[in-house]
Regions:
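PLP-dependent class I/II
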Residues: 2-261
Length: 261
């Protein structure tokens, strides 16, 4: 299973627990975007064994997203092989520039799209996810789901249905609040000497540490001890993550201002 990194670390143990091997592509030199030529190279090097490619966008931890041209270029590569793309689009409604484009729209016969209401409606604790893809694939996923989680509780399903039917406009004020927090943090972190990209989505900043502080684990431990501020070491997100830290702006503006001080 090909996994572009840095990426949400949960994918890696899931691949391992299913007896598969993760194949990492470091995207840190490419603006944290998976490039089609690097994808093709990785597939060709493992052509007899590759079954899937993982995409997550807007991405945790970088906040980077893919536009239509990016996705079409990747789809052109994937179409050449009998493989699937597992497209985790849980942050789709938290896209700040342009409109989110789903890989399911571009590659319907080979894409399995994951989404839910956790991020779009701040319903993380309800544990309601959505999977869409080719009918035969979804049928097999249903079998696995039945014997692992059985089903989502009825009240959670009804709450998610209400959110999707009558609460789609609720995301907008939340997104506007995130953008204000993002802009505040970018300004504060830049003033502190960190290199900070402008995230296109989600609610994370993946800030590059000064070279003298390159060890992200040491940095986050020191920050927690001395400033009582918790961030995540970039090294925990796979190859290409070292030398960075992930900062969440899902916290309140008051807490972010206190942390910045």
């Amino acid at each position: 299973v090909i996994i572009p990194t840095p990426i949400f670390p949960l994918y890696i143990p899931i691949v391992l627990l299913n007896g598969a091997k993760p194949i990492f592509i470091d995207t840190s030199e490419d603006g944290f975007i998976l490039k089609p030529e690097k994808l093709q190279k990785a597939i060709e090097a493992n052509k007899d064994t590759v079954k899937a490619v993982v995409l997550n966008y807007p991405t945790n931890p970088t906040g980077v997203t893919y536009d239509r041209a990016d996705l079409e270029a990747l789809a052109a590569v994937i179409k050449q092989y009998e493989i699937f793309v597992l497209s985790d689009e849980i942050y789709s409604e938290l896209t700040y520039t342009g409109k989110h484009v789903s890989m399911g729209e571009i590659l319907p016969d080979q894409a399995v799209v994951l989404n839910g209401v956790s991020k779009s409606h701040a319903m993380t604790g309800w544990r309601v996810g959505i999977t869409a893809g080719p009918a035969d694939v979804i049928q097999q996923i249903g079998k696995v789901s039945e014997f692992t989680i059985t089903s989502v509780t009825t009240n959670a399903q009804r709450a998610a249905e209400e959110a999707l039917k009558n609460g789609m406009d609720d995301t907008q004020p939340m997104k506007e609040a995130y953008m204000k927090r993002r802009d505040f943090l970018i300004k504060a972190l830049t003033a502190a000497g960190l290199t900070v990209p402008n995230p296109d989505g989600a609610f994370y900043i993946f800030a590059k540490l000064p070279e003298r502080m390159h060890d992200s684990w040491k940095f986050v431990y020191a920050l927690a001890r001395e400033a009582k501020v918790a961030v995540i070491p970039g090294a925990s997100f796979g190859p290409g993550g070292e030398g960075y830290v992930r900062i969440s702006y899902a916290a309140s503006m008051a807490d972010l201002k206190l942390a910045a001080e």
